[in-house]
Design a protein with these regions (language model features):
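N-terminal DNA-binding module of tyrosine recombinases/phage integrases
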Residues: 1-78, 93, 274-287
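Phosphate-coordinating loops and pocket residues in cytosolic domains that bind phosphorylated ligands
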Residues: 31, 70-73, 85, 134, ...
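C-terminal flanking helix
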Residues: 56, 121-124, 128
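Short, conserved phosphate-binding/catalytic loop or strand-edge motifs used
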Residues: 69-84, 95-100, 139-143
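Short, basic/aromatic-rich helical patch in the C-terminal catalytic core of site-specific tyrosine
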Residues: 76, 120-124, 187
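Basic, Lys/Arg- and aromatic-enriched nucleic-acid-binding interface segment
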Residues: 89-119, 129-190, 200-203, 252-254, ...
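Arg/Lys-rich amphipathic alpha helix in sigma70-family domain 2
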Residues: 125-134, 269-272
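Conserved tyrosine-mediated DNA breakage-rejoining catalytic core shared by Y-recombinases
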Residues: 142, 157, 190-276, 282, ...
Length: 287
């Protein structure tokens, strides 16, 4: 038996298939892989946060204790099968939650399973490069994404929605969103410097190049802060999250949008109001 094992090792060394035995688990590997990839690719805070959530809530609870070298494709397929029947939010921050009967009926989407597959695919390829695995156990075929058709509001629906809003801040935020197809963080990240009333022959434009986000403080300690323009002071003592202002993700996300006449007028009135408020309380607008 010793002789056979010696010959087997010699053959594996000759063919480049020798693997140093390792007891590293899936959880240990992924929690080592995550910060390294974040640093290498300069992930944005939300990218790090979403990948951490996938690992903590959808991978570690099910296969985290398994040793990497004992993992086989059928284990990954079994994980996908389990996740397809798992309620959304079953685990948060790596801790299991008790869900109501209604909550238990809403299971994870195919898109979420696809994201888990992509993370495992990318990370386990690196495990091969690192010499932990000879071959990735992640199946070639990924879970099918869930396709949902988005409904687009008609002009009448947009007008009705705006007419129903009495709060001027909410009205302006929704108006900007509808005209520019903005995300929530992009609306919050707009400043007076982004607005040009004279552009486009007086039609007016506004430029989207920043986004406001709320992220975990643990995340901020891990990510590259090059894209972060400002971290706002906490309003509540002991808060576990921070409000940040950051650059948009890509050059494509940075865009200039034409105003409608109604939006142009509303923005002018809003900026005039801000100037009046600033004159009455300069300290509020200095921070």
């Amino acid at each position: 038996d010793v002789y056979k094992r010696q010959k087997q090792i010699e053959h594996e060394l000759a063919t480049g298939n020798f693997l140093i035995p390792s007891t590293v688990t899936v959880a240990e590997f992924l929690m080592d892989w995550l910060p390294k990839q974040c640093s290498k690719h300069k992930w944005a805070p939300k990218t790090y946060q979403s990948n951490l959530a996938l690992i903590q809530n959808l991978i570690i609870p099910y296969i985290g204790e398994m040793q990497m070298q004992k993992l086989r494709p059928y284990h990954i397929e079994a994980l996908y099968d389990t996740l397809s029947k798992t309620p959304c939010g079953q685990y948060v921050g790596g801790k299991r939650r008790d869900l109501s009967p209604k909550q238990q009926k809403r299971t994870l989407s195919g898109t979420t399973l696809h994201e888990v597959h992509q993370l495992l695919h990318n990370s386990f390829l690196l495990a091969v490069e690192w010499g932990i695995l000879i071959k990735s156990p992640v199946p070639v075929e990924a879970p099918k994404k869930t396709t949902q058709e988005r409904s687009i509001w008609e002009v009448e629906e947009m007008r009705a929605a705006l007419d129903s809003m009495e709060d001027p801040i909410l009205h302006l935020a929704v108006h900007l969103t509808l005209v520019g197809a903005l995300r929530e963080g992009e609306v919050a990240g707009l400043t007076p410097e982004d607005i040009d009333f004279d552009a486009a022959n007086g039609m007016g434009t506004f430029t989207v190049n920043r986004s406001m986000q709320r992220v975990q403080k643990d995340t901020l300690a891990q990510v590259d802060k090059g894209c972060i323009l400002r971290i706002f002071p906490d309003k509540l003592e002991g808060s576990k999250t921070s409000l940040i202002l950051k650059d948009t993700k890509t050059e494509a996300s940075c865009r200039t949008i034409f105003m409608t006449a109604a939006l142009r007028e509303e923005l002018k009135q809003w900026l005039e109001r801000l100037k009046r408020e600033e004159a009455l309380d300069p300290e509020r607008y200095r921070n």
